[in-house]
Amino acid sequence: MTKATIVLATRNAGKVAELADALRAYGLDVLGLDAFPQVGEIEETGTTFEENALLKARAVAEATGHVAVADDSGLEVDALERRPGVYSARYSDDTPDLPGDTRDARNNAKLLLELDGVPAERRTARFRCVMAACTPDGRHVFAEGAWEGHIALAPEGDNGFGYDPLFIDPQSGLHSAQLSRDEKNARSHRGKALRRLLELWPAFWRG
Protein backbone atom coordinates (compact mmCIF):
# COMPACT_ATOMS: atom_id res chain seq x y z
CA MET A 1 0.00 0.00 0.00
CA THR A 2 1.40 3.37 -1.04
CA LYS A 3 2.12 5.78 1.77
CA ALA A 4 -0.34 8.64 1.70
CA THR A 5 -1.53 11.73 3.51
CA ILE A 6 -4.82 11.13 5.23
CA VAL A 7 -6.88 14.04 6.52
CA LEU A 8 -8.90 13.45 9.66
CA ALA A 9 -12.04 15.52 9.28
CA THR A 10 -12.00 17.07 12.73
CA ARG A 11 -10.47 19.88 14.76
CA ASN A 12 -11.11 17.99 17.98
CA ALA A 13 -7.58 17.58 19.36
CA GLY A 14 -8.58 14.53 21.40
CA LYS A 15 -9.91 12.69 18.38
CA VAL A 16 -6.93 13.65 16.23
CA ALA A 17 -4.47 12.33 18.82
CA GLU A 18 -6.43 9.14 19.41
CA LEU A 19 -6.89 8.25 15.75
CA ALA A 20 -3.51 9.49 14.54
CA ASP A 21 -1.71 7.15 16.94
CA ALA A 22 -3.24 4.13 15.23
CA LEU A 23 -3.04 5.43 11.66
CA ARG A 24 0.66 6.31 11.93
CA ALA A 25 1.37 2.71 12.87
CA TYR A 26 0.26 1.79 9.35
CA GLY A 27 2.74 4.15 7.67
CA LEU A 28 0.24 6.89 6.92
CA ASP A 29 0.91 10.62 7.27
CA VAL A 30 -1.92 12.07 9.32
CA LEU A 31 -3.15 15.65 9.43
CA GLY A 32 -6.14 17.22 11.13
CA LEU A 33 -8.24 20.07 9.82
CA ASP A 34 -6.07 22.64 11.58
CA ALA A 35 -3.63 22.09 8.69
CA PHE A 36 -6.34 23.17 6.24
CA PRO A 37 -7.74 26.52 7.36
CA GLN A 38 -9.61 26.85 4.07
CA VAL A 39 -12.01 24.11 5.19
CA GLY A 40 -14.88 25.74 7.01
CA GLU A 41 -17.19 24.33 9.65
CA ILE A 42 -19.13 21.33 8.37
CA GLU A 43 -22.66 21.20 9.70
CA GLU A 44 -23.80 17.74 10.78
CA THR A 45 -27.27 17.65 9.25
CA GLY A 46 -27.66 13.87 9.07
CA THR A 47 -30.00 11.88 11.26
CA THR A 48 -27.71 8.84 11.51
CA PHE A 49 -24.06 8.29 12.34
CA GLU A 50 -23.50 7.01 8.78
CA GLU A 51 -24.96 10.12 7.15
CA ASN A 52 -22.91 12.50 9.27
CA ALA A 53 -19.64 10.59 8.83
CA LEU A 54 -19.94 10.49 5.04
CA LEU A 55 -21.07 14.11 4.82
CA LYS A 56 -17.91 15.24 6.64
CA ALA A 57 -15.51 12.89 4.83
CA ARG A 58 -16.82 13.84 1.40
CA ALA A 59 -16.66 17.58 2.09
CA VAL A 60 -13.07 17.40 3.38
CA ALA A 61 -11.85 15.14 0.56
CA GLU A 62 -13.26 17.53 -2.02
CA ALA A 63 -11.79 20.59 -0.28
CA THR A 64 -8.28 19.20 0.34
CA GLY A 65 -7.71 16.81 -2.55
CA HIS A 66 -6.69 14.06 -0.09
CA VAL A 67 -8.44 10.96 1.12
CA ALA A 68 -10.41 12.00 4.19
CA VAL A 69 -11.51 9.98 7.18
CA ALA A 70 -14.38 11.21 9.30
CA ASP A 71 -16.25 9.67 12.15
CA ASP A 72 -19.54 10.31 13.79
CA SER A 73 -19.91 8.81 17.18
CA GLY A 74 -22.06 9.10 20.21
CA LEU A 75 -23.39 7.57 23.36
CA GLU A 76 -26.50 5.39 23.35
CA VAL A 77 -28.12 4.90 26.77
CA ASP A 78 -30.69 2.12 26.87
CA ALA A 79 -32.78 3.63 29.67
CA LEU A 80 -33.10 6.83 27.60
CA GLU A 81 -34.23 5.02 24.43
CA ARG A 82 -30.68 5.26 23.07
CA ARG A 83 -30.37 9.00 23.57
CA PRO A 84 -28.32 11.12 23.20
CA GLY A 85 -27.19 9.25 20.06
CA VAL A 86 -26.30 11.47 17.11
CA TYR A 87 -26.96 14.52 19.30
CA SER A 88 -24.34 13.52 21.90
CA ALA A 89 -22.02 16.48 21.28
CA ARG A 90 -24.78 19.07 21.66
CA TYR A 91 -27.04 17.21 24.09
CA SER A 92 -27.22 20.00 26.66
CA ASP A 93 -27.66 22.90 24.25
CA ASP A 94 -31.43 23.07 24.80
CA THR A 95 -31.23 22.77 28.60
CA PRO A 96 -30.47 26.00 30.50
CA ASP A 97 -28.85 26.38 33.91
CA LEU A 98 -26.83 23.17 33.91
CA PRO A 99 -23.60 23.20 35.95
CA GLY A 100 -20.25 23.18 34.16
CA ASP A 101 -17.88 25.55 32.39
CA THR A 102 -17.66 23.48 29.19
CA ARG A 103 -20.15 21.82 26.89
CA ASP A 104 -18.73 18.40 27.86
CA ALA A 105 -19.36 19.14 31.53
CA ARG A 106 -22.91 20.31 30.83
CA ASN A 107 -23.60 17.25 28.67
CA ASN A 108 -22.47 15.02 31.51
CA ALA A 109 -24.58 16.96 33.98
CA LYS A 110 -27.68 16.55 31.80
CA LEU A 111 -27.05 12.82 31.42
CA LEU A 112 -26.79 12.36 35.18
CA LEU A 113 -29.94 14.41 35.68
CA GLU A 114 -31.92 12.28 33.23
CA LEU A 115 -30.63 9.07 34.83
CA ASP A 116 -31.39 10.22 38.37
CA GLY A 117 -33.00 7.32 40.21
CA VAL A 118 -32.21 4.76 37.49
CA PRO A 119 -30.58 1.71 39.18
CA ALA A 120 -27.15 0.48 38.14
CA GLU A 121 -28.46 -2.59 36.32
CA ARG A 122 -30.53 -0.36 34.01
CA ARG A 123 -27.74 2.12 33.22
CA THR A 124 -26.39 0.05 30.33
CA ALA A 125 -24.97 2.03 27.44
CA ARG A 126 -22.60 1.92 24.54
CA PHE A 127 -20.37 4.25 22.64
CA ARG A 128 -20.98 3.75 18.92
CA CYS A 129 -18.77 4.98 16.10
CA VAL A 130 -19.17 4.95 12.34
CA MET A 131 -16.14 5.91 10.25
CA ALA A 132 -16.22 6.87 6.61
CA ALA A 133 -13.23 7.15 4.30
CA CYS A 134 -13.80 9.07 1.09
CA THR A 135 -11.63 9.87 -1.92
CA PRO A 136 -11.77 13.23 -3.71
CA ASP A 137 -13.73 11.53 -6.52
CA GLY A 138 -16.38 10.28 -4.11
CA ARG A 139 -15.54 6.62 -3.53
CA HIS A 140 -16.22 5.72 0.07
CA VAL A 141 -16.29 2.93 2.60
CA PHE A 142 -17.84 2.60 6.07
CA ALA A 143 -16.61 0.86 9.21
CA GLU A 144 -18.35 0.60 12.57
CA GLY A 145 -17.44 -0.20 16.16
CA ALA A 146 -19.21 -0.30 19.51
CA TRP A 147 -18.03 -0.31 23.14
CA GLU A 148 -20.51 -1.70 25.65
CA GLY A 149 -20.54 -0.49 29.24
CA HIS A 150 -22.67 1.41 31.70
CA ILE A 151 -23.08 4.90 33.11
CA ALA A 152 -21.62 5.73 36.52
CA LEU A 153 -23.29 7.74 39.27
CA ALA A 154 -20.54 10.38 39.19
CA PRO A 155 -17.62 11.32 36.91
CA GLU A 156 -14.08 10.04 37.49
CA GLY A 157 -10.77 10.49 35.66
CA ASP A 158 -8.95 13.21 33.76
CA ASN A 159 -8.13 11.49 30.45
CA GLY A 160 -10.29 11.58 27.36
CA PHE A 161 -13.16 13.89 26.54
CA GLY A 162 -16.93 13.89 26.09
CA TYR A 163 -18.70 11.31 28.22
CA ASP A 164 -15.49 9.43 29.12
CA PRO A 165 -15.68 10.45 32.82
CA LEU A 166 -19.10 8.76 33.17
CA PHE A 167 -18.64 5.65 31.02
CA ILE A 168 -17.51 2.53 32.89
CA ASP A 169 -15.55 -0.08 30.93
CA PRO A 170 -16.69 -3.53 32.14
CA GLN A 171 -13.37 -5.20 31.32
CA SER A 172 -11.34 -3.07 33.70
CA GLY A 173 -14.05 -1.65 35.94
CA LEU A 174 -12.55 1.79 35.34
CA HIS A 175 -14.12 4.89 33.90
CA SER A 176 -13.03 5.54 30.32
CA ALA A 177 -11.37 8.76 31.48
CA GLN A 178 -9.14 6.70 33.81
CA LEU A 179 -7.71 4.57 31.01
CA SER A 180 -4.45 5.31 29.22
CA ARG A 181 -4.64 6.20 25.55
CA ASP A 182 -3.34 2.75 24.56
CA GLU A 183 -5.88 1.01 26.81
CA LYS A 184 -8.67 3.12 25.42
CA ASN A 185 -7.64 2.51 21.79
CA ALA A 186 -7.67 -1.24 22.44
CA ARG A 187 -11.22 -1.20 23.83
CA SER A 188 -13.00 1.80 22.40
CA HIS A 189 -15.67 2.09 19.74
CA ARG A 190 -13.40 4.39 17.77
CA GLY A 191 -10.49 1.95 17.99
CA LYS A 192 -12.70 -0.92 16.83
CA ALA A 193 -14.09 1.10 13.94
CA LEU A 194 -10.59 2.16 12.95
CA ARG A 195 -9.27 -1.41 12.99
CA ARG A 196 -12.17 -2.46 10.79
CA LEU A 197 -11.48 0.45 8.44
CA LEU A 198 -7.84 -0.57 8.19
CA GLU A 199 -8.90 -4.13 7.31
CA LEU A 200 -10.87 -2.65 4.41
CA TRP A 201 -8.18 -0.12 3.49
CA PRO A 202 -6.08 -2.07 0.92
CA ALA A 203 -9.10 -2.84 -1.28
CA PHE A 204 -10.41 0.70 -0.84
CA TRP A 205 -7.01 2.20 -1.69
CA ARG A 206 -6.64 0.10 -4.83
CA GLY A 207 -10.13 1.22 -5.91
Swiss-Prot record:
Which residues are noted in the entry as Mg(2+)-binding?
Answer: 43, 72
- Quote the catalytic activity from the record: XTP + H2O = XMP + diphosphate + H(+); dITP + H2O = dIMP + diphosphate + H(+); ITP + H2O = IMP + diphosphate + H(+)
EC category = hydrolase
Q: Give the E.C. number(s).
A: 3.6.1.66
Binding-site residues, substrate? 10-15, 73, 161-164, 184, 189-190
The UniProt similarity line reads: Belongs to the HAM1 NTPase family.
Q: What is the name of this protein? A: dITP/XTP pyrophosphatase
Task: Give the organism the record lists.
Answer: Nitratidesulfovibrio vulgaris (strain ATCC 29579 / DSM 644 / CCUG 34227 / NCIMB 8303 / VKM B-1760 / Hildenborough) (Desulfovibrio vulgaris)
| Upper taxonomic lineage | Bacteria, Pseudomonadati, Thermodesulfobacteriota, Desulfovibrionia, Desulfovibrionales
